[in-house]
C-alpha cells in the first residue's frame, strides 16, 4: 500500500531522526468500523506492518503500528530504535466523527525487520501498566525480554505451489494418519539443545514419509513463555515460537513438508490465555479480552483467563488468527484444543461457581456461535482445509455442517474410543472376557461424528505411563498386546492419530524436557514395533476399504462381536465399490485354530498383514495365508471361512470374489 502525506518540515533528515508521524495525518486505512469487522483484513493490518509513505516527494519505508486499547489514556511503542523512551513514540488515537475505534497508531520511518519493541500503555486513570508484547506480533523473543520483533511476511518465497493448488477433496473419504509431535522433545542434540525448524526439515520429514504418515500434527507452536505448558498457554497467537527459529524457518519447514507430500496441522488454543503480565491480561487496564467475572472469565484448573466470546473484538481477533495461519504459513488444518471447555459454562465448576445462559442452561452460546463462524470462515477461504475438534463430551453435531445446525468442524477426536479401548486393553487377558462390552461399545456411536481415533499425548503423561507400559503381562506379552491393539485401531472406522514414540514402543512416560527413547531401536522388539507401524500406515493408505467409508456405517460390518469368552473380534471394512478387508483380533495369548467365521459371499481371503509376524518380533505362529470360503453357513450368513488367529494378534485379509 502506497500512502501519501504532506509535511510542514523541509528537513527530511530531521524528520527521520524524530521519525514519528501522526497516523491520522499520513495513513489511509479501511474505515475503522470496517477494519474491525473483517478478520481476513485484520491479520494484515493490525500490529507492526511494513509500509511505504511519500514524505516531501520521497518514498520512505517504515513500520506502521496499530493496536487496540480502547480504555488506555496513552499508548507508546518503545524499542531499541528510540532507546526505550516512551515519549519519543506516542501513538495517536484514531477517531472518526462520532466513532471512537479504540485503535492507536503510529508510523515510524526506516525501521527494519528484526527491530525489538513493546507497547507501553497507561490505563484510563493515567497509571502506567506493565510493558506489553504485541497481541498481533509476528515474531517474539524468549525469556527474559519477551520482546516483539518486526517481521515482514512477504519475504519468504514459497515453493509448494503444486501442493497448494491440488484439487479439493472430501477429507472424510481420504486416508488420514496423523503423527502428533512436540517439537522440543522429538529429538535433542547431544548437548540438550533443540532441533531447529530447518534441522527438523532434514530429519523429521524423511522419517515421517518413510513411516507412511499422511499428516504431521504439531502441538501448539504459537509463542508461549513457559516451555512446560507444551504450548497450551500461548501469549503470541500470531507468532510461531522462536525457540526453534524464525518465522521464515518455520515457513521453510512447512514448505518442505508439502514438497514431500506431507500435510501439516497445528494445535490451536482459543479456549484461554495465560495471566502473564506482558500478555493480554489487563491489556489496557481492563479485562479487555476476558469476562471480568471469574465465574465466566477465569479457568480454575489451568489458572488462566477465558476469552470473552461475546465481544466483537475478541471474536474477530480469534477468527483472524485462524485465517492467518492458513494464509501466511500454508497450514492444512487446525486442531482446536479444549473445545468442551468453551462449550459449557459449568465446565469443571461446582454449583455456584458459574453463571447460566439466558435460558438458564449451561451452553455458552457466544462460544458456540464463534466456533461456527471460525469454521465457516476457514472453509470458505480454504476449502481444502481441515478443522478438527478436541471435544470430550457428547455435544451434538460437532462435525455436522453449520447449515444443518452443527458446529461445522470437519472431524472430532474420538475420546470415547480412546478411553474405552485403553481400559479394555489394560486388563489382564484372562479378565478381558468380563469387559467385552467396553471394547465393542464405541461402535455404537462410531458414525455419529466424523471421528479421528486418537492415541494422543494426553495418554502418556501425568503418571499414566507409556502405551507400552499400559499393556499387561511380561515383556513379550506387553509388546504383543500393543501390536494387536494398534492393528485393531487401524482396522476400526475412523482416521488415525498416534503420538510420537508410539511407533518405537516407548517405555518411559513422555517428558517434554527430554527426547524420545531412540536407543530402544537397538532392541528387536522395538525395531519390530517401528516396522509394524510403518506397514500399518502403508497398508491403510493402500486399501480404500480401510478409509474410504470411515465416516459411513456402510463401510463396516461385524462378523463376530459377541465372542466374549474368547476375547475375539472380527469385522469387515468396505470401500465405495464394495471391496472388502476382513480384520480379526485375538486379545488372548491362546491361538485360535480353525475358528469359523460367517461371511456373505463366495471367494478367497488373502492375508495382507499379521501383527504376530516375526518381522515385527512376533511369534510367527503358523496361519493360513489364503482361505477359501466354504458353503457352510455360520453366524447367520450362507458361507464361512475357517481361520487361524495367532495369540495376541490382529490379522488383515483382503477379499477376492469368485469370478462372476
Map each language-model feature to its residues.
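Conserved alpha/beta catalytic core and glycan-binding cleft of carbohydrate-active enzymes
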Residues: 143, 330-332, 347-515, 520, ...
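Substrate-binding/active-site clefts of carbohydrate-active enzymes
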Residues: 141, 161-173, 182-363, 627, ...
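C-terminal beta-strand-rich structural cap/linker in extracellular carbohydrate-active enzymes
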Residues: 113-116, 624-660
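The feature marks proteins involved in alpha-glucan
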Residues: 1-64, 94-180, 185-192, 199, ...
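Catalytic cores of secreted or luminal carbohydrate-active enzymes
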Residues: 525-546
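Conserved, mostly hydrophobic/aromatic
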Residues: 67, 119, 181, 208, ...
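Short proline/glycine-enriched turn/loop motifs at strand-loop junctions of beta-rich domains
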Residues: 68-75, 600-603
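Solvent-exposed beta-strand/loop surfaces of large extracellular or lumenal domains
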Residues: 81-103, 612-636
Amino acid at each position: 500500500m502506497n500512502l501519501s502525506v504532506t509535511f510542514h518540515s523541509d528537513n527530511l533528515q530531521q524528520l527521520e531522526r524524530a521519525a514519528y508521524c501522526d497516523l491520522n495525518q499520513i495513513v489511509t486505512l479501511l474505515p475503522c468500523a470496517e477494519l474491525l469487522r473483517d478478520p481476513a483484513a485484520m491479520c494484515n493490518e493490525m500490529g507492526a506492518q511494513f509500509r511505504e509513505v511519500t514524505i516531501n516527494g520521497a518514498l520512505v519505508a517504515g513500520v506502521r503500528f496499530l493496536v487496540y486499547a480502547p480504555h488506555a489514556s496513552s499508548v507508546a511503542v518503545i524499542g531499541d530504535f528510540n532507546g526505550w523512551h516512551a515519549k519519543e513514540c506516542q501513538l495517536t488515537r484514531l477517531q472518526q466523527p462520532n466513532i471512537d475505534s479504540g485503535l492507536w497508531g503510529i508510523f515510524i520511518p526506516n525501521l527494519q525487520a528484526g527491530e525489538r519493541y513493546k507497547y507501553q500503555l497507561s490505563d484510563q486513570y493515567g497509571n502506567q501498566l506493565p510493558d506489553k508484547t504485541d497481541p498481533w506480533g509476528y515474531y517474539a523473543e524468549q525469556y527474559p525480554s519477551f520482546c516483539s520483533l518486526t517481521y515482514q511476511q512477504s519475504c519468504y518465497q514459497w515453493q509448494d505451489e503444486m501442493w497448494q493448488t491440488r484439487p479439493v477433496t472430501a477429507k472424510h473419504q481420504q486416508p488420514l494418519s496423523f503423527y502428533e509431535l512436540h517439537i522440543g522433545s522429538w529429538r535433542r542434540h547431544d548437548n540438550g539443545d533443540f532441533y531447529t525448524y530447518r534441522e527438523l526439515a532434514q530429519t523429521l520429514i524423511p522419517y515421517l514419509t518413510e513411516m507412511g504418515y499422511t499428516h504431521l500434527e504439531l502441538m501448539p507452536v504459537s509463542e508461549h513463555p513457559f516451555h512446560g505448558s507444551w504450548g497450551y498457554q500461548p501469549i503470541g497467537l500470531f507468532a510461531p515460537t522462536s525457540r526453534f527459529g524464525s518465522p521464515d524457518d518455520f515457513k521453510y519447514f512447512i514448505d518442505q513438508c508439502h514438497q514431500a507430500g506431507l500435510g501439516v496441522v497445528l494445535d490451536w488454543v482459543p479456549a484461554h490465555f495465560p495471566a502473564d503480565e506482558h500478555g493480554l491480561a489487563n491489556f489496557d487496564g481492563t479485562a479487555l479480552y476476558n469476562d471480568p467475572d471469574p465465574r465466566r472469565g477465569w479457568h480454575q484448573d489451568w489458572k488462566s483467563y477465558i476469552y470473552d466470546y461475546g465481544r466483537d473484538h475478541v471474536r474477530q481477533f480469534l477468527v483472524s488468527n485462524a485465517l492467518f495461519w492458513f494464509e501466511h504459513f500454508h497450514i492444512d488444518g487446525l486442531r482446536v484444543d479444549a473445545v468442551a471447555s468453551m462449550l459449557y459454562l459449568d465446565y469443571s465448576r461446582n454449583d455456584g461457581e458459574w453463571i447460566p445462559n439466558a435460558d438458564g442452561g449451561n451452553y455458552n452460546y457466544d462460544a458456540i456461535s464463534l466456533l461456527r463462524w471460525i469454521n465457516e470462515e476457514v472453509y470458505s477461504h480454504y476449502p481444502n482445509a481441515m478443522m478438527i475438534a478436541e471435544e470430550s463430551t457428547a455435544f451434538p453435531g460437532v462435525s455436522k455442517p453449520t447449515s444443518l445446525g452443527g458446529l461445522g468442524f470437519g472431524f472430532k477426536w474420538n475420546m470415547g474410543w480412546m478411553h474405552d479401548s485403553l481400559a479394555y486393553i489394560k486388563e489382564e487377558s484372562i479378565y478381558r472376557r468380563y469387559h467385552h462390552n467396553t471394547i465393542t461399545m464405541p461402535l455404537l456411536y462410531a458414525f455419529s461424528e466424523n471421528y479421528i481415533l486418537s492415541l494422543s499425548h494426553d495418554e502418556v503423561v501425568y503418571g499414566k505411563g507409556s502405551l507400552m507400559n499400559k499393556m499387561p503381562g511380561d515383556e513379550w506379552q506387553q509388546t504383543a498386546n500393543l501390536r494387536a491393539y494398534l492393528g485393531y485401531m487401524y482396522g476400526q472406522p475412523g482416521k488415525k492419530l498416534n503420538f510420537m514414540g508410539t511407533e518405537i514402543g516407548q517405555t518411559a512416560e513422555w517428558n517434554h524436557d527430554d527426547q524420545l527413547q531412540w536407543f530402544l531401536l537397538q532392541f528387536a522388539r522395538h525395531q519390530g514395533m517401528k516396522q509394524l507401524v510403518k506397514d500399518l500406515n502403508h497398508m491403510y493408505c493402500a486399501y480404500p476399504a480401510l478409509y474410504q467409508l470411515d465416516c459411513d456405517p456402510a463401510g463396516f460390518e461385524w462378523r463376530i462381536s459377541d465372542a466374549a469368552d474368547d476375547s475375539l473380534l472380527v469385522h469387515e471394512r468396505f470401500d465405495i465399490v464394495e471391496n472388502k478387508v476382513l480384520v480379526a483380533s485375538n486379545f488372548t495369548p491362546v491361538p485360535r485354530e480353525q475358528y469359523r467365521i460367517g461371511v456373505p459371499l463366495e471367494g478367497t481371503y488373502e492375508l495382507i498383514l499379521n501383527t504376530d509376524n516375526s518381522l515385527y518380533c512376533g511369534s510367527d505362529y503358523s496361519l493360513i495365508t489364503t482361505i477359501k470360503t466354504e458353503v457352510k453357513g455360520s453366524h447367520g450368513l450362507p458361507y464361512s471361512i475357517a481361520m487361524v488367529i495367532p495369540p495376541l494378534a490382529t490379522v488383515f485379509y483382503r477379499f477376492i470374489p469368485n469370478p462372476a
